[in-house]
C-alpha cells in the first residue's frame, strides 16, 4: 500500500502540473493537430479515388548519362584500331581513351619505330574499378582469341583463383618480409593491365584512375615538347596564411649549396682534363658542406669522374670513404625524411659501377671481394632486410664483374645497336676479354638459386644475351653457340629472328674470329634442314625491320667477303650482299 501510495502520489502531481499550464496554449496545439489530421485524411481520401497507375510519382529526376567521348583515329590507321576503340568504349564502358601513333614520334624518341618494332599504336583507357578492368581484359582476350585466332600477351591481370604452389610462394615471401624495393606497383590487382594484341602492332593499357595518374604513361608515348606544354603544376592556395613562405633557412641553404656543387661537377664533365682535375677537386671541397644526401652523392660522382681521368688525384679508397661519411653523418641521421634502404640500394649499384670502371686495375676476384665486404658493411645501416637479387641491374653488374677488358672496348647489346644505327660502320679491332670461368659459373649458379630458382623460370633474354657475348669474346665458342641456339629457338616472331641474325653477324665480324664466322655461314646461314637466315628472310617477305638494319648487314657482309675472299662461304656472303 505504501508503494502504491507513492506511485499514486507521483501520478497525481504530474497530472496537476500538466493541467496547470495555460489553457490557450493547449487548445491551440490541439486545434493545429486536429486540422492537420483532417487535411491528411482529406488528401488520403482524394488519392484513394485516383487509380494507382494515374497517380503522380514522387521519384527523383532522371539524370542524363554523359556519352563516352571517342578520340579521333590517326590518319591511315588500320581497321582493327577502329574495332578495338569501339569495343573498349561502347562494349566495355572504358573512358578517357587516348591513342598514340608512334610513327609520328621523332627518330631519337625511345618509343619511335626506329628504336623498336613491336608497338605501332598505343591505347590508354581508364576503368571504374579493378573489377571493371579485369572484366574488360577478360572479354578482350576472348575477343582476340575468337576473332584473330591467337591468344594475346596480357600482363597484370590476376583473378582470385590462385594455385597451391603460388600460395606457398606468397606465404614464404611474407615470412621473409617485404624487400627494400617493394612498392605499391603490382600489389593492387588489376590496377594496370597491359595487352599486346598481336594485331597491327596495337598495344592496350587498361588502368585505374589512381594508377594512371601515378604512372603518367602519356609522358612515355608523347613527344617531349608536347609533354612540357601539357605539364601542369599543382595549384597553390594563395589564401593560405603561409603562402609564399619557404620551408626554412636550412633547406634553402642546402639547395643553394647543392646547385653550386652541381655547377662545378658539370663544368668538370665538359671542360675537365688530366691537368685541371686537382683544381676542380679543391674547388668542390671548398664548397662542400655535407648537409644533405644529394651533396654526398654529387661528391661521389665527381670523385669517380676524376678517378677515371687522373687516379693520382683521387684514389679508390677515397671514393669508398665518401659513402661511409654519408652513413656516419649525425646531421643526416636526424633527417627523418631520408629513406635509407633506398640509399643503400642506390649506393650498392653505384659502387658496383665504380668497380666496373676500374677495369684491369684489379682482377675479377679482387673486385668481388671488395663488393662482398662493401655489402656486408653497408647493410648494417638497413632498417629492414634487403634482397638485392630482386634488382635486375644488380644481377647484370654482378655478371659484368666476372671479366675485365684491357682496352675497354668490349661488346654488348647497346654497342651492337649503335653499330646498326651507323649502318654497320665500326672501327676494326680485336675484342677480347679476360674472363674468370670459375667465377662465372659460380655467379650464374648464384643468380639461378636466388632469383630464378623455379623450374618454370629461366634467365631473361637480356641476361642470356649478355652471357653469350661474354663467352664469345672470351673465346669459349662451345658455350657461345649453345646459348646462341637457345636464344634463337626462344624467338617466336620472324622480325625478332631477323634482328638476331643481323647482330650475330655484326658481333662475329667485330670479334674477328675466322672459325666462328665460318661456323655461322656454313652451318646456319642457308641450312635447308634447320634454322637459317635465308629461311627467316624469305618468311619475312625479304624485309628487314629498318633500312639501317639492312645497310648494316650489307656493309658487314661486304667487309667479310673482302677480308676472306679466298673462302667460298665468304664469297657467297658477299654475293648475297650485292642483292640487298
Swiss-Prot record:
Protein keywords: Membrane, Mitochondrion, Mitochondrion inner membrane, Transit peptide
Subcellular location, record wording:
Mitochondrion inner membrane
* Gene Ontology CC: one annotated term: mitochondrial inner membrane
Spell out the Pfam families in the cross-references. RsfS
Q: Which membrane topology describes this protein?
A: Peripheral membrane protein
Signal sequence interval, chain numbering: none
The organelle transit peptide extends over: 1-38
Report the InterPro entries cross-referenced here.
Atp25, NT_sf
Q: What is its main location?
A: mitochondrion
Q: Name one GO biological process term.
A: mitochondrial gene expression
- State the function annotated in the UniProt record: Probable mitochondrial mRNA stabilization factor.
The text of the family note is: Belongs to the ATP25 family.
Q: What is this protein called?
A: ATPase synthesis protein 25, mitochondrial
Q: What is the lineage of its organism?
A: Eukaryota, Fungi, Dikarya, Ascomycota, Saccharomycotina
Gene this protein is translated from: ATP25
Amino acid at each position: 500500500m505504501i508503494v502504491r501510495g507513492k506511485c499514486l502520489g507521483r501520478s497525481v502531481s504530474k497530472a496537476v502540473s500538466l493541467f496547470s499550464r495555460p489553457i490557450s496554449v493547449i487548445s491551440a496545439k490541439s486545434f493545429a493537430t486536429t486540422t492537420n489530421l483532417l487535411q491528411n485524411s482529406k488528401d488520403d481520401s482524394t488519392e484513394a479515388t485516383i487509380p494507382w497507375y494515374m497517380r503522380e510519382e514522387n521519384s527523383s529526376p532522371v539524370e542524363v548519362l554523359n556519352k563516352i567521348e571517342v578520340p579521333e583515329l590517326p590518319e591511315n590507321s588500320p581497321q582493327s584500331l577502329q574495332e578495338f576503340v569501339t569495343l573498349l568504349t561502347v562494349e566495355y564502358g572504358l573512358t578517357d581513351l587516348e591513342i598514340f601513333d608512334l610513327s609520328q614520334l621523332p627518330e631519337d624518341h625511345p618509343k619511335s619505330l626506329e628504336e623498336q618494332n613491336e608497338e605501332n599504336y598505343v591505347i590508354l583507357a581508364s576503368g571504374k574499378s579493378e573489377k571493371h578492368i579485369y572484366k574488360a581484359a577478360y572479354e578482350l582476350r576472348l575477343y582476340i582469341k575468337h576473332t584473330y585466332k591467337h591468344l594475346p600477351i596480357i600482363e597484370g591481370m590476376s583473378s582470385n583463383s590462385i594455385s597451391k604452389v603460388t600460395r606457398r610462394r606468397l606465404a614464404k615471401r611474407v615470412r621473409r618480409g617485404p624487400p627494400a624495393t617493394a612498392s605499391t606497383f603490382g600489389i593492387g590487382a588489376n590496377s594496370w593491365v597491359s595487352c599486346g594484341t598481336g594485331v597491327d602492332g596495337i598495344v592496350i593499357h587498361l588502368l585505374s584512375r589512381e594508377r594512371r595518374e601515378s604512372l603518367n604513361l602519356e609522358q612515355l608515348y608523347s613527344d617531349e615538347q608536347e609533354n612540357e606544354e601539357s605539364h601542369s603544376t599543382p595549384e597553390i592556395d594563395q589564401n593560405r596564411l603561409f603562402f609564399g613562405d619557404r620551408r626554412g633557412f636550412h633547406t634553402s641553404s642546402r639547395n643553394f649549396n647543392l646547385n653550386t656543387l652541381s655547377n662545378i661537377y658539370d663544368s668538370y664533365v665538359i671542360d675537365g682534363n688530366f691537368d685541371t682535375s686537382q683544381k676542380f677537386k679543391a674547388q668542390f671541397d671548398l664548397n662542400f658542406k655535407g648537409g644533405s644526401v644529394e651533396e654526398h652523392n654529387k661528391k661521389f660522382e665527381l670523385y669517380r669522374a676524376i678517378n677515371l681521368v687522373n687516379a693520382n688525384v683521387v684514389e679508390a679508397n677515397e671514393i669508398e670513404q665518401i659513402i661511409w661519411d654519408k652513413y656516419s653523418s649525425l646531421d643526416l641521421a636526424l633527417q627523418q625524411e631520408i629513406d635509407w634502404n633506398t640509399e643503400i640500394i642506390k649506393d650498392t649499384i653505384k659502387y658496383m659501377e665504380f668497380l666496373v670502371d676500374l677495369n684491369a686495375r684489379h682482377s675479377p676476384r679482387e673486385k668481388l671481394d671488395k663488393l662482398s665486404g662493401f655489402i656486408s658493411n653497408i647493410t648494417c645501416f638497413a632498417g629492414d632486410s634487403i634482397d638485392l637479387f630482386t634488382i635486375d641491374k644488380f644481377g647484370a653488374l654482378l655478371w659484368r664483374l666476372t671479366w675485365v677488358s684491357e682496352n675497354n672496348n668490349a661488346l654488348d647489346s647497346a654497342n651492337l645497336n649503335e653499330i646498326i644505327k651507323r649502318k654497320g660502320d665500326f672501327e676494326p679491332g680485336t675484342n677480347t676479354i679476360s674472363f674468370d670461368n670459375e667465377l662465372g659459373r659460380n655467379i650464374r649458379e648464384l643468380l639461378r638459386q636466388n632469383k630464378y630458382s623455379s623450374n618454370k623460370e629461366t634467365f631473361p633474354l637480356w641476361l642470356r644475351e649478355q652471357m653469350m657475348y661474354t663467352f664469345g669474346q672470351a673465346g669459349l665458342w662451345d658455350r657461345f653457340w649453345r646459348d646462341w641456339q637457345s636464344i634463337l629457338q626462344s624467338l617466336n616472331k620472324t622480325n625478332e629472328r631477323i634482328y638476331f641474325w643481323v647482330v650475330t653477324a655484326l658481333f662475329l665480324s667485330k670479334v674477328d674470329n675466322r672459325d666462328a664466322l665460318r661456323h655461322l655461314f656454313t652451318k646456319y646461314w642457308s641450312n635447308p634442314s634447320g634454322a637459317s637466315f635465308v629461311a627467316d628472310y624469305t618468311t619475312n617477305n625479304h624485309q628487314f625491320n629498318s633500312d639501317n638494319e639492312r645497310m648494316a648487314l650489307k656493309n658487314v657482309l661486304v667487309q667479310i667477303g673482302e677480308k676472306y675472299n679466298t673462302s667460298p662461304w665468304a664469297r657467297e656472303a658477299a654475293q648475297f650482299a650485292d642483292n640487298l
